[in-house]
Amino acid sequence: MNESKRENIQVINIGDCRAVLCKNGLAIPLNKDHKPIWPDEKRRIDRVNEKYETNEKIHFDAGDWRIGDLSVSRSFGDLDNTPYVTHVPDLFDYQLQSDDEFIIMACDGVWDVLENHEAINFVRDHRNDNHTEFYSIPGKYPNREAFESDNISRKLASYAIARGSTDNVSVIIIFFSKE
């Protein structure tokens, strides 16, 4: 990345999908999960709850605070749990630096079984297997298809399942070119 031309990225999230940046080997979260137990979200829910006489939608179940049957405090389409669950996303800005290597974007099926640094280390350990990094750079190998075994996102998803994830698992990895 050209130091004189730094670029900004914006991460918009809702729910418990997470974007984690690898910066020179360190895991840097680029957003936060929307869980009812987190202080900011709890305050927002408490303010809403003051307007209503009952809070039977908010309860502790299966090791998580839940709103209705959801373990998140923000989501799209869950109108049954309005106004406690909001559809307003958070926006996070980040200025890319030359030591930024890649971003992992994944759903909670990954983050429930892997810590941020574990996922970052997994990708760093496997990024050179069959040149998987280059499949994410448009035009780098225009005449070669990425085989399933070469796909590092698939490898990370499979690793999360092997670690015991029982939730849905989806992963996107964006590598930054040093060119």
UniProtKB/Swiss-Prot annotation:
Entry GO MF terms: protein serine/threonine phosphatase activity
PROSITE patterns according to UniProt: PPM_2
InterPro entries: PP2C, PPM-type-like_dom_sf, PPM-type_phosphatase-like_dom
Location of this chain's protein in the cell: Virion
A single cellular component GO annotation: virion component
SUPFAM superfamilies cross-referenced by the UniProt entry: PP2C-like
Protein name: PP2C-like domain-containing protein R307
Principal localisation: virion
A Pfam cross-reference name: PP2C
PANTHER family: PROTEIN PHOSPHATASE
Tree of life domain: Viruses
Lineage, uppermost ranks: Viruses, Varidnaviria, Bamfordvirae, Nucleocytoviricota, Megaviricetes
Domain PPM-type phosphatase: 1-176
Keywords associated with the record: Virion
Organism, as annotated: Acanthamoeba polyphaga mimivirus (APMV)
